[in-house]
Structures are given as structure tokens and as C-alpha cells.
Amino acid sequence: MKFQSEYYLVDIDGTLTDYRPGACAPEKLLHGNFLLPIIRDLMVEKGWDKTEAEKAIFDMKERGVFWDYTEFIAEFGIPTGETFRRLRQWHHDNLIVYHDTVRLIKKLAGQGKQLFVMSNNPYMGCIFKLQAADLAKDDFSSPYFRRIFGTNILRGCKCVPDVWKRAFAQIPAEIPEIGVIGDNPKEDGELPRSLGVKDIHIIPRATIARGIDREETKK
């Protein structure tokens, strides 16, 4: 594959990392999320009743559609360092890392390409996955990515055209000069192509347990 663009938006799930089979089994989730049980457990350790903690998490999640995990830390006063440690450990234990694409990202960055994360995860979710793939440091910085466009940054997921437009508007280049690297033929291929992206690289993956797939990706 030839990577001719100077700027690339790079997907995470299915491209750089994926969930191990069973990692996101329904019985392990809280309100449809695999990390919220960690938030709840920390709240219980702080003195919350379990049921009340789960309700408080749900209410906060519903109030702000495009939330990030740091908001739960701030709202409920759970210890920041321990929360980050457990969230990071979850990713270490439950993610598959696609080393072929990780090597590609490091190579492109070494060539001076300007790389940006384009993900359906909130900002901190992106960070933890990049850390698991050795693409971000413990202080949350990344020597490979200029910006991280999570769902709370762009106010939506990649299945929405306006979300792509908001990402394009934050890159100092015209849309035809921006490339995309991902695994989803629709979200990472057809949609950005319809908006004017020309340099698109879809990395095929064998069918494996993908954790929680949104309905849009199943069509």
C-alpha cells in the first residue's frame, strides 16, 4: 500500500486493537459499558451502596451523551490514580494488539506523516487503548499522534457525516489531502470517500469477537 497523503485519520478498534473473546460479555457490563463496573466498584469502596452507585452512574451517563471517564472521577470523588491504574490494567488484560498496524503507524510517524486518531471511543478510552498498543505514554501523551478525536471531542461517532466534517475542520489541510486508515469498509471507507477523501486504506481483519458492535456496523 502506498501512503501518499501527509495527513491521516486513524481508527483504533479493529485497526490497532480489539477485544479478546469474552472481554465484553453481557454479564461483565454495566449500562452497556465494560469499564463502568470499575467506576462502580471504586464508588462502593468509597462507601456507596452498590445499587445507588449504579443508579448514579446511569443518571450521569444519560445527562451527558458525549462523556468521558474522567467526568465520573470528578463527579463521584473516586481516587484518580487508582482509577487510572485499574482502567489501564483492564485494557492490558482484555485487548488484542494488532502489531502489524502498530508498526505501520510508527513507520508513518517516522516519515513525518501527521497522524490523528479518529475513534468511536471517548478521549480517555482512546488513550488507554493506545497505551496498550505502545502508542501513548503513561502521562497520556503520544509521540505518534498529533490529536486524538474521541467521541466527546467530536460529539458523536464515525457513522455520522458531521462528525467527520468536525474532524476535517481541525486539520490544517483540504479534505482531498487527508487520508484514512481503518478496518470498517463503511465507516472508514464509503463515508469519508463520500465527503471527498481519496486516500483510504481499509485493513481487512478475520472475523473475531468484536465486543460491542453498534447496529450501524452490522448492516
Q: For the regions a protein language model found, what residue spans apply to each?
A:
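Asp-based, Mg2+/Mn2+-dependent phosphohydrolase catalytic module
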Residues: 1-10, 102-106, 113-219
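Short, acidic loop-to-helix structural element flanking the phosphoryl-transfer center
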Residues: 67-76, 85-117, 161
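A metal-dependent, Asp-based hydrolase signature
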Residues: 34-88
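Charged, low-complexity C-terminal accessory regions
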Residues: 61, 94-96, 126
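Short histidine/acidic/glycine/proline-rich micro-motifs that form metal-
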Residues: 16, 23, 58-62, 91-92, ...
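Flexible, glycine- and charge-enriched loops at secondary-structure boundaries
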Residues: 28-32, 94, 157
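Active-site neighborhood of HAD-like aspartate-dependent phosphohydrolases
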Residues: 1-52
